[in-house]
Amino acid sequence: MSAAGSNAVGTAIAFRGSHAAVHRSLISKAADGVQISASGVMVAENLIETRAASPGDHNDAIQLLGSPKHITIARNKILNRNPQTSCLYLAGEHIEVRSNYVSGGGWTIYGGASNNGKGGAGASDVAVVDTIFGRDFFEKSGNFGPVTYWNKANVWRDNRFSDGVTIAP
């Protein structure tokens, strides 16, 4: 159920138990595509897209919540047509984001520094590598830009806009 109380899906897939994967799936028509609060999770080769926001929704295509560990997000197409929230909301430890196509959200990626502005240690041992930032919905990939709350101690390498322009965090 969405925040607006309609019959719309709030979260398509929620990982609460460890050592699971979603692979080669279409995940759509939900406010949040995938929520991960478990460890040892892989999300690979999927199309993940949020639906248009209903009043009260807080749409994220992929959310890492709490302190998940050993998460891999690879070779997905991740879309959030909404001008708020994100495609990827990162938290936890040992997070690998590689070879994805991401586009949309307020900020396309919330990088996890300072727990995305909520205080505390935030995400650590994060690598975002070889990811393409599309401009499907907004000129800067996200409505406000491609990335925010990035911890410079983490790895950011070979990330670019779809036209090849390099993105620095």
Language-model segments: residues:
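Extracellular beta-strand/beta-solenoid scaffold signature
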Residues: 5-14, 28-35, 55-65, 81-92, ...
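Right-handed parallel beta-helix
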Residues: 1-5, 16-32, 39-53, 69-81, ...
